Amino acid sequence: MRILFMGTPDIAAECLKALYAAGHEICGVYTRRDKPVGRKQVLTAPPVKEVALEHGTPVFQPRTLRDGSEDANIRALAPDLIVVVAYGCILPKSVLEAPKYGCINLHVSLLPKYRGSAPVQWAVLNGDTETGVSIMQMDEGLDTGDVLVCEKIAIGPEETSGELFDRVTAVGARVLCEAVPAMEAGTLKPQPQQHENATLAPMLDKELAEFRLTDTAAHIHNWVRGMNPWPMAWFATAGGKKVKVTECRVAASDGEAPGTVLSTKPLTVACADGAVQLLHVVPEGKKPMDGTSFAAGLRLKAGDTL
């Protein structure tokens, strides 16, 4: 089966590697354009492009597919199937209908839950105990196509989005490689999504990453896990300083007011319904440190307000 692959970030690169390793014929790769990265704004290729070039596969980086400018090229590549993993461009009807087997997409949630760009993060932010991966037959909607395959994945109670994403990537690559031959054999049974149960997983940003010590312990704990590694959960101290929290644990309190320091070893602070241990933090303008060192730097003691 001739596969045209479309994807951009690390998860897509891992899936492309898996397809190569499984012996599939990749007739071409579409990815987003190179972009400036870092403080020096070095023009950097997407991870998928690097993998494709290592295998000598033609790479295409159009600004868009929606204007029809790539239709002729896609037809010339003559793919039997288009595989999409976090490409970042909308596929028009002309592209969706070009291959014999259409287009399939790996989505890292149990559809119809968490449609959108940040499904792994929102599963953690919401305190879910499981998520999964879905292989979907693409249509013109946003993650609305029939589900061909899905597999559940448990979420650890202390697992961060970054840690979970690594596991989801590995499972997704495996499930994708299993789905391709099954699709060719005609053994997959499309299951329409229950659209009335759909939820969205919008992009994260630094403003959304804020929590308050007046929030519940569970909310703070989930926010810290879900916003790690980016954009990192943060709160503002009583003095107005921004503090990122990279690791915390839920703890008990005796009903002290939110923001009250209960202990400095480890740094434990009361919140709405209990307390949280702030184990690792990044104070504004400073390097990462453990919570105890942060407390020492501020000369905090039990009973103070953070």
State where each predicted segment sits.
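Structural motif corresponding to alpha-helix initiation and N-cap regions
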Residues: 13, 42-45, 67-71, 117
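N-terminal Rossmann-like dinucleotide-binding module
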Residues: 1-39
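Internal alpha/beta domain cores that form substrate/cofactor-binding pockets in large enzymes
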Residues: 2-4, 25-30, 55-77, 82, ...
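Donor/substrate-binding cores of folate-linked one-carbon enzymes
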Residues: 22, 32, 81-200
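Active-site-lining helix/loop region of Rossmann-like oxidoreductase modules
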Residues: 178-237
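A residue-level signal for conserved active-site and pocket-lining positions in enzyme catalytic cores
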Residues: 7, 29, 52, 82, ...
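An anion-binding loop in the catalytic cleft
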Residues: 213-306
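N-terminal beta-loop-helix "entrance" segment that forms/cooperates
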Residues: 35-55
